[in-house]
Each structure stands twice: as structure tokens, then as C-alpha cells.
UniProtKB/Swiss-Prot annotation:
<dbReference type="InterPro" id="IPR036005">
    <property type="entry name" value="Creatinase/aminopeptidase-like"/>
</dbReference>
<keyword id="KW-0963">Cytoplasm</keyword>
<comment type="subunit">
    <text>Homodimer.</text>
</comment>
<feature type="binding site">
    <location>
        <position position="327"/>
    </location>
    <ligand>
        <name>Mn(2+) 1</name>
    </ligand>
</feature>
<dbReference type="InterPro" id="IPR029149">
    <property type="entry name" value="Creatin/AminoP/Spt16_N"/>
</dbReference>
<dbReference type="Pfam" id="PF01321">
    <property type="entry name" value="Creatinase_N"/>
</dbReference>
<dbReference type="InterPro" id="IPR000587">
    <property type="entry name" value="Creatinase_N"/>
</dbReference>
<dbReference type="InterPro" id="IPR050659">
    <property type="entry name" value="Peptidase_M24B"/>
</dbReference>
<protein>
    <recommendedName>
        <fullName>Xaa-Pro dipeptidase</fullName>
        <ecNumber>3.4.13.9</ecNumber>
    </recommendedName>
</protein>
<dbReference type="GO" id="GO:0102009">
    <property type="term" value="F:proline dipeptidase activity"/>
</dbReference>
<dbReference type="GO" id="GO:0006508">
    <property type="term" value="P:proteolysis"/>
</dbReference>
<dbReference type="InterPro" id="IPR000994">
    <property type="entry name" value="Pept_M24"/>
</dbReference>
<feature type="binding site">
    <location>
        <position position="298"/>
    </location>
    <ligand>
        <name>Mn(2+) 1</name>
    </ligand>
</feature>
<keyword id="KW-0479">Metal-binding</keyword>
<dbReference type="GO" id="GO:0005737">
    <property type="term" value="C:cytoplasm"/>
</dbReference>
<feature type="binding site">
    <location>
        <position position="234"/>
    </location>
    <ligand>
        <name>Mn(2+) 2</name>
    </ligand>
</feature>
<comment type="similarity">
    <text>Belongs to the peptidase M24B family.</text>
</comment>
Length: 368
């Protein structure tokens, strides 16, 4: 179905050939994903000919056995891949003048190699915006995978909370989370590098886990996600290890209130900027606006960051079927940081999260 949309777009826009270069986008159109490393892995679609998947011989049998039921063309390391691509295209069609290229995944070296095979062709049309647009709206089968990834994230939080004890490093907690995901859930890939930040480290939103040790009576921020059959989860929770101070409780409750208000307000027809403003106003009115230093959210799907961007000034209208995060944060340098994040799908009834770990402030007991 997705590939039909691409072929229809080619016909409507007077394009002869589509060059799809990102492994994630190839997965979207074919149901097959692999890491080709330095080798060539591409999808070619045509306005009036059958598409084909081009891959290393190492991946040929895997591709043939995948959900992709179209042609697969493999090549050996000893062969010239670009010459073989050109030969395959010229056998399929005489129309290869006008190309639509996924420029977001195109390297200069690959463009030069392709242009050398088709020196008279026009490669100026960008396919990236069309791909981003159709990926905005998730099908029910995609939502099933996103919900499953959310369940895995909820499991990971419980492992992380249980791993906290005096003197444990942030990295050791991460290792426990990722080990148990593999052992108990069969999760072989996280959607990004797992973040665990204790105390003042949590005031640096995207700082990775360090050898910093967890100490009693501080906040600990978790930001984590998994890949489930090619679809990502991404969720954040902040907990207290030991008894938090009144100030810690205050910033937590302000942030939790802002996040829940945005979840409750989200509906089709409002703009991304309006939704961002719901949470931002609450945090600003509480006196912490200067510490909310990022957008409210981002799209999610086959990649952990997709469109739409839920940001101040973005007037894109939110529609049913869009999936995105709602994740306000308050980060006070030298003190603490709080982020609470859920990804979900926008329906006519509102925003439906994929993760369900409680957002009441969890005060964990101190353990030796």
C-alpha cells in the first residue's frame, strides 16, 4: 500500500524513477530492514515498471524471505554496484530522465556514482518531503507496534527504578535496564542511547549516563526507548531516590501538571504551537519558564524523532493519526532536572499515550 502511494506520486508529478536511500524509509515501503554497513542498499520505484530492492549478496536471501514480495537484485563485493543498478533500470524501462531522490539519505559520493551512470538525467526533485508527509499518519498495524514498544519502555522503567541504590553509577543502571530488556523481553535494540541522570546531572537534558553515583535524597531522570519490529518508543520519568526537598517536589508537580494539561488539551485541529503553549504557560506562570529550554515534543514512528515538531511557532495543524511526544521539562543548573514524557497517537477523542508508568512522584526507598 505504501509503495502504491509512491508510484501514484511519481505519476502525478511527472517523475520516472524514485531513488529511496534511507534504510528506515526502505523498511517503510518494503517491510525489510538491514544494516548494509558500507555496502549499497537501495530501493528503486518507477511510474510504469515494477520496483526492485537492491542489496548486497550477503542480505539477498534475508530480503527474499522478508515481507517484501517484489524483485530483489543482489550484488557481490567484486561487482560494481552502480553499473549493475544502471543495467537493471535500463532493462525495466526506457524512461529514466526525471528522478525523485530521497535527498535526506543521499551522500555526495552516491550522487556522483549515480550521475555517472545517468549523465543526462535530472536528479533535482526531492522525495524527502513526500516521504515525511505520508509517514506522519500511522496505520493500525503501525500503532500496534508502537504500543508494543511502549509496553517494553514501561517494563524498562521498573527495572531502572529497582536498580537504584547508594553508590550505583548511572551507567550501571543503564546496563541493568538494557540487559533485562534483552533477557526478559528479547529487545535487541534501544531506540536511542538510554539516559539515566542523577542529581544535578539531570539539569543537562541530553547528557549521557556517566560514572556519577546515585546518592540519597535526589531526583533521578530516566529517558529510554526500544525498537519493536522497526518502530520506536521514547518515554521519560523522574523519580525521587530517598526523600526529595520541597523545591524538588515543587518543580516535579509543576512539570507534571503542565504535561497532563497538554495531554488533556491535545485535539485534532489545533496547531503544534498552540499545544506547546499549553504546557509552556503553566511552567512560565509558576516562575520556571527560563528552565524549559526545548520544544514540547516531536513525532515518533520508525525513527525516534520524526515530524511533527510540537514547538512554539510551528503552525502545522495536528490531525488524527499523528503520533508525537508530550515532554515538558524543567532543568535548573547545579540543582536538578525533571522531565516527564509520553508518546502517543492523536485520535478524535484526544491523545492516547503508548506508555502508562505512573506519573505521581515515586519516592523510592534508600538501599545500601
Amino acid at each position: 500500500m505504501n509503495l502504491d502511494k509512491l508510484q501514484n506520486w511519481l505519476q502525478e508529478n511527472g517523475m520516472d524513477v524514485a531513488y529511496v536511500s534511507s534504510p528506515t524509509t526502505i523498511n517503510y515501503f518494503t517491510g525489510f530492514i538491514t544494516d548494509p554497513e558500507e555496502r549499497i542498499f537501495k530501493l528503486f520505484a518507477f511510474k510504469d515498471a515494477e520496483p526492485f530492492l537492491f542489496c548486497p549478496a550477503l542480505n539477498y536471501e534475508e530480503a527474499k524471505a522478508s515481507a517484501w514480495d517484489g524483485d530483489v537484485v543482489g550484488y557481490l563485493d567484486s561487482e560494481d554496484p552502480w553499473g549493475k543498478i544502471a543495467e537493471e533500470i535500463k532493462q525495466r524501462t526506457k524512461d529514466y530522465q526525471n528522478w525523485a531522490v530521497e535527498k535526506n539519505g543521499l551522500t555526495v559520493a552516491h550522487y556522483q556514482a549515480l550521475h555517472a551512470q545517468f549523465p543526462d538525467s535530472d536528479f533535482s526533485k526531492d522525495l524527502s518531503d513526500f516521504i515525511a508527509h505520508i509517514r506522519l499518519f500511522k496505520t493500525e498495524s503501525e500503532l500496534v507496534k508502537l504500543r508494543k514498544a511502549g509496553e517494553e519502555a514501561d517494563f524498562a522503567f521498573q527495572i531502572g527504578f529497582e536498580a537504584l541504590r547508594n553508590g550505583v553509577t548511572e551507567r550501571a543502571v543503564v546496563s541493568q535496564i538494557e540487559y533485562q530488556l534483552k533477557l526478559q523481553k528479547g529487545v535487541m535494540q534501544t531506540s536511542f542511547d538510554t539516559i539515566v541522570q542523577a542529581g544535578k546531572n539531570a539539569a543537562n537534558p541530553h547528557q549521557g549516563p556517566s560514572m556519577n553515583t546515585v546518592q540519597p535524597n535526589e531526583l533521578v531522570l530516566f529517558d529510554l526507548g526500544t525498537m519493536h519490529e522497526g518502530y520506536a518508543s521514547d518515554s521519560s520519568r523522574t523519580v525521587a531516590y530517598g526523600e526529595p526537598t520541597d523545591k524538588m517536589r515543587e518543580i516535579y508537580e509543576v512539570n507534571r501538571t503542565a504535561q497532563q494539561a497538554a495531554i488533556d488539551a491535545a485535539k485534532p485541529g489545533m496547531t503544534a504551537s498552540e499545544l506547546d503553549g499549553v504546557a509552556r504557560k503553566i511552567i512560565t506562570d509558576a516562575g520556571y519558564g527560563e528552565y524549559f529550554i526545548h520544544r514540547l515534543g516531536h513525532g515518533i514512528g520508525m525513527e525516534v524523532h520524526e515530524f511533527p515538531s510540537i514547538a512554539n511557532g510551528n503552525d502545522v495543524v495536528l490531525e488524527e493519526g499523528m503520533c508525537f511526544s508530550i515532554e515538558p521539562g524543567i532543568y535548573i543548573p547545579g540543582f536538578a532536572g525533571v522531565r516527564i514524557e509520553d508518546c502517543g497517537v492523536l485520535t478524535k477523542e484526544g491523545f492516547k499515550p503508548f506508555t502508562h508508568t505512573s506519573k505521581e512522584l515515586k519516592v523510592l526507598p534508600v538501599k545500601e
